[in-house]
């Protein structure tokens, strides 16, 4: 689901400035985030959660916010194919900075993956061969069932950087009001 201009230019700028000034951002070295720089839950992102959640709930149902994560991609960075961990049912990825020539799409498979993602799969062809490229302009977002649909970004080959923030929610489950009735 594409959401055009879900964040204003000023909101994007505020988040990027907080990221650039943060002493807690980390250079990622593992295979799935290689060469990117990340920041867990920038405080400025929390002020946006309620408004964004209201836009998502008509499509995804009742949600409970889990966390946000901001990531900058530099030349050589990747986001390996994966599904989000349990508890991160719905993901909203928003472009905060597009300081490069060309495109850097978020790829999302149309084929679901059931169960915890397995990093050691011999091939990802079943998911990569039936995928859609989601190109996000500044302030645009893409929302998906991140726990169910594999998604990734290919290697960032451009000069400059691409900065995105990811908001994650879990689906609220209706409370159990009565114990199950015995059968048999």
Question: Whereabouts are the PLM-identified features?
Answer:
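Catalytic core of non-heme Fe(II) oxygenases with the double-stranded beta-helix
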Residues: 75-147, 174-180
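Short strand-connecting beta-turns/loops that link adjacent beta-strands
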Residues: 8, 86, 159-160
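Non-heme Fe(II)/2-oxoglutarate
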Residues: 1-60, 78
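Short, charged beta-turn/beta-strand-edge "cap" motif at the junction between a beta-strand
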Residues: 147-151, 156
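Histidine-centered active-site/metal-ligand motif
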Residues: 82, 150-151, 168
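A short coil-to-beta-strand element that immediately follows conserved catalytic motifs
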Residues: 60-70
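A cross-taxa feature marking solvent-exposed loop/turn segments within ectodomains of secreted
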Residues: 63, 99-101, 160
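A short hydrophobic beta-strand segment most commonly corresponding to one strand
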Residues: 91-94, 158-175
């Amino acid at each position: 689901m594409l959401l055009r201009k879900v964040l204003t230019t000023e909101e994007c700028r505020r988040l990027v400035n907080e990221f650039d000034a943060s002493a807690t951002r980390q250079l990622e070295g593992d295979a799935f985030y290689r060469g990117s720089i990340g920041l867990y839950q920038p405080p400025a992102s929390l002020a946006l959660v309620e408004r964004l959640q209201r836009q998502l709930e008509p499509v995804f149902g009742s949600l409970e916010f889990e966390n946000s994560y901001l990531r900058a991609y530099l030349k050589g960075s990747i986001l390996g194919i994966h599904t989000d961990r349990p508890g991160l049912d719905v993901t909203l990825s928003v472009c905060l900075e597009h300081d490069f020539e060309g495109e850097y799409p978020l790829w999302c498979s149309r084929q679901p993956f059931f169960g915890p993602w397995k990093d050691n799969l011999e091939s990802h062809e079943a998911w990569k061969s039936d995928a859609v490229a989601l190109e996000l302009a500044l302030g645009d977002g893409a929302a998906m069932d991140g726990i169910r649909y594999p998604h990734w970004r290919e290697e960032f080959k451009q000069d400059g950087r691409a900065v995105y923030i990811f908001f994650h929610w879990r689906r609220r489950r209706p409370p159990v009001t009565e114990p199950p009735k015995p059968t048999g």
